Amino acid sequence: MSEFSQTVPELVAWARKNDFSISLPVDRLSFLLAVATLNGERLDGEMSEGELVDAFRHVSDAFEQTSETIGVRANNAINDMVRQRLLNRFTSEQAEGNAIYRLTPLGIGITDYYIRQREFSTLRLSMQLSIVAGELKRAADAAEEGGDEFHWHRNVYAPLKYSVAEIFDSIDLTQRLMDEQQQQVKDDIAQLLNKDWRAAISSCELLLSETSGTLRELQDTLEAAGDKLQANLLRIQDATMTHDDLHFVDRLVFDLQSKLDRIISWGQQSIDLWIGYDRHVHKFIRTAIDMDKNRVFAQRLRQSVQTYFDEPWALTYANADRLLDMRDEEMALRDEEVTGELPEDLEYEEFNEIREQLAAIIEEQLAVYKTRQVPLDLGLVVREYLAQYPRARHFDVARIVIDQAVRLGVAQADFTGLPAKWQPINDYGAKVQAHVIDKY
């Protein structure tokens, strides 16, 4: 094998030579997780064979397996894990038959995947990024100082390879676990909606909001530190440009830059995809609510009919007369239904025709003010016109006068921003607020 990387044929030959194989049914995997959990409580990280048998007994009881063959099955499970290099067995001549067991790196890696890594923590991610930032800064300072090959290997390459790269891999693994959690949340939401969507709405909202918040915390933490990390990587890259013999450092820096870009970009893309799924679920719930209105009524009615003899009920219904909208513009007033037929000299004349005639008369009379350039006091003019008409027509006449007056010109006092005084326009309390029109 080479120092920095292995080819596919080399890896295949290595796995074949060492006879690597893993087979973990659900009961064996549960046993391994139980061992890892109990092992975490030991200060020395060691477990005796009796403790492993006790852990196996808990797993066997959980799977409702027979207790008569606990000893034999526990011994087989322990030997199988030792053979698969998940446990290391240590024996001594002084304590024959009382072996000591420790989890192997493979066993720790598998249990970490199922236990520790599934617990997302913003604080943990912040600490990892803080450590990475410190390592990168020290490596960048060492790169700018320069030195011999040993200096570059010890102070630049080693921190990047064995500290920064491993933490990047850990963050990448966290993101991949988040991908699995998102898929699990989607499956849970689908099951909830298939059972009873009305009762599942609150649970779905909780799952959606928790996942969205976790993704956003992860991305915010990464983006906050991303620029500083990239800046230090660029410092190292600039320092290696004048050294032809530092291609191994330059290649490692390029790999780290690509990995950091991939981590940040995938975090944002994951948020965008989750937002789309969130909208899809809410749209489905809204559609289901709209479609279920009549279904709920029909279900309740059907249930009431089925339980009528046990719980009798009476149905009361109302059939009210239809309400007519008298303000409908499309309705034509039929005079013969109200007043009967009228003589020709009392024929009804629509108000629209009267309004047009009145507007023409008022427009002609008000035009004198524009021709003579005389200020038009709208309050006095409206009062004079209203005095000529009955009270029932005051509102319509006042509106016509004001409409025609504002077409003639404007009041310069309007541009001062000061409000005009209220002026009475009839003897019944009506008032108008308008400045004198003096610019035509």
Curated annotation (Swiss-Prot):
Q: Name one Pfam family in it.
A: KicB
Main localisation: cytoplasm
Q: Acyltransferase among the record's keywords?
A: no
Q: Which domain of life is it from?
A: Bacteria
Spans annotated as Leucine-zipper: 208-236
State the Gene Ontology terms under molecular function: calcium ion binding
* Keywords in alphabetical order: Calcium, Cell cycle, Cell division, Chromosome partition, Cytoplasm, DNA condensation
Please describe the quaternary structure of this protein. Answer: Interacts, and probably forms a ternary complex, with MukE and MukB via its C-terminal region. The complex formation is stimulated by calcium or magnesium. It is required for an interaction between MukE and MukB.
Q: Which HAMAP family match?
A: MukF
Name under which the protein is recorded: Chromosome partition protein MukF
Per the UniProt record, the source organism is Escherichia fergusonii (strain ATCC 35469 / DSM 13698 / CCUG 18766 / IAM 14443 / JCM 21226 / LMG 7866 / NBRC 102419 / NCTC 12128 / CDC 0568-73)
